[in-house]
């Protein structure tokens, strides 16, 4: 059952990470926003009429920091996808095929995914020094957002990275010895009995 729960968590984290990667809402100003792969702009006061552009390749991205961040974040997402698929196969495979004594290589793959995503998330704010970001976020510089503010896409990516790193931990399952606790009918409180 634990493998099934980990597989479900891995698949949901993969989906959430994918959504945050394609989100254009990592840094946002009053009339535009951008993410790792997408940029959107809109007329002031009319945020429902957005025009969005996707960076087609690494060549289209404005700076080296942007390219490094995109490559490491996408690599982390691919590793997370692989680990989720491995865990799903592990959970759905017949028990007679192999003994389920561990999780195989998935903790290592998940740890590599978490490290890759961490590197990408730490490098991404350096994109604020690019001419593209300076045009959107007036007064921005490396690790200073200027007129922009962090938005939900970047926060979701950080949360996904933290949850992925927690997924690596194999929680120790302990068996609790059950004992009857006597109750007093007068006070209706538990009486502690030393062993």
From Swiss-Prot:
Subcellular location: Membrane
Transmembrane segments: 7-27, 73-93, 108-128, 149-169
Chief subcellular location: membrane
Disulfides per UniProt: none
InterPro entries, alphabetized: LHFPL (IPR019372)
Membrane topology: Multi-pass membrane protein
Keyword annotations from UniProtKB, A to Z: Membrane, Transmembrane, Transmembrane helix
UniProt superkingdom: Eukaryota
GO cellular component, one term: membrane
Family: Belongs to the TMEM211 family.
PANTHER family: LHFPL TETRASPAN SUBFAMILY MEMBER 7 PROTEIN, LIPOMA HMGIC FUSION PARTNER-LIKE PROTEIN
Protein name: LHFPL tetraspan subfamily member 7 protein
Organism: Mus musculus (Mouse)
